[in-house]
Regions:
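PLP-dependent amino-acid enzyme catalytic core
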Residues: 1-344
Length: 344
């Protein structure tokens, strides 16, 4: 039987993240929610502290994706996302860290988006940026012509003699999903060392690459918790199919005899609000609460909505005070500055 610590060793990987990230015991947050008589123990898995370009979960995916780009002798990477995409920001940084060029196709609802937050950082990393109009449905994160525009950009680059490597939105591919399959092993080992057996792990879910990796990791390493994904954008049916495909592609890469079906990949749809990238009242309240109690910053687009789901379950009594739960902090802090008006 393959040892868990050698499962990923044969795969190309570039060390971009500062690992392992710590597990933080949110004692004051628990106290604010009623103490140990009313609130479960809450742990934060601090993937906001991965280190790459202000941190975040994408560093784990990019360790495998950038390595694959280098293996294929790419000269540049191309990826896409919203104008305040955490993934785009971290991809730009990762590419620069290994000497690759970077081109971003970013969706926007403004013809001239302000140079702040992640968009400012993209420009500081010297990314070539193509802006396209976002789609009409704010709940859907991907623009209708996004894939076509990426293809056009890749064709243009190829004609110029470049060798572009395309990274899907969110780094959500079989290669990218390896990041959180490996990340699950890290969590399992930390929990064993701390003698902890949490019952559930909450995380924000967008393009579903993180979900795919966590689901694969759960089947490979059997953590004690069940996964509680919280959707931050719409398109659930299509995304379930995508997540299953990605997870199974990742399983094949590590030669794991695992099959994951779309029906297994459920996420909480109650906290999307008006749409992707649009803050919610409950999310903003969660940001303030966690900041004031723990000195930890969440972001309005992803982690605030996931924390709002966790808080709703605690307040409804769905999580017992005897339980321990984990919140996967996936980063995204630069987006706070792009949403400053929400806090006035």
């Amino acid at each position: 039987m393959t040892r868990p610590d050698t499962l990923f060793s044969a795969l190309p990987r570039v060390p971009l993240a500062t690992l392992p990230t710590p597990i933080h015991d949110a004692v004051r947050l628990r106290r604010a929610l009623g103490g140990d008589r009313r609130c479960p123990r809450i742990l934060f898995k601090r993937d906001d502290l991965t280190g790459l370009a202000l941190g975040g979960n994408k560093a784990r995916k990019l360790e495998f994706l950038i390595a694959d780009a280098c293996r294929r002798e790419a000269t540049s990477v191309v990826t896409t996302g919203a104008v305040q995409s955490n993934h785009a920001r971290m991809t730009a940084a990762a590419a620069r860290a290994v000497g690759l060029g970077v081109t971003l196709v970013l969706t926007t609802r403004e013809p001239a988006p302000p140079k702040q937050g992640n968009y400012l950082l993209d420009r500081l990393f010297g990314a070539t940026i193509h802006l396209i109009a976002a789609g009409p449905d704010p709940r859907i994160a991907v623009a209708p012509d996004e894939e076509q525009r990426v293809s056009e950009v890749v064709e243009e680059m190829t004609r110029r003699g470049e060798r572009p490597y395309v990274i899907p939105v969110g780094g959500s591919s079989g290669v990218g999903a390896l990041g959180y399959a490996a990340g699950t092993l890290e969590i399992v080992e930390q929990l064993k060392e701390l003698n902890l057996k949490p019952s559930r792990l909450y995380y924000a879910s967008g393009s579903r690459g993180t979900q795919a990796g966590l689901e694969l990791g759960a089947r490979l390493f059997m953590p004690p918790y069940r996964l509680c994904g919280v959707a931050v954008s719409g398109g659930e049916d299509e995304k379930r199919v995508r997540a299953a495909r990605i997870a199974n592609e990742a399983a094949a890469l590590v030669r794991a005899q695992v099959t994951i079906t779309a029906e297994e990949l459920v996420t909480d749809q109650q906290h999307i609000g008006e749409g992707y990238g649009i803050s919610t009242r409950e999310g903003l309240q969660a940001i303030r609460l966690v900041a004031e109690q723990e000195g930890i910053l969440l972001d309005p687009v992803y982690t605030a909505k996931a924390m709002a789901a966790l808080l709703a379950d605690v307040r409804a009594g769905d999580a017992s005070p005897d339980e321990t739960i984990i919140f996967l902090h996936t980063g995204g802090v630069p987006a706070l500055f792009a949403h400053a008006g929400s806090f006035q």
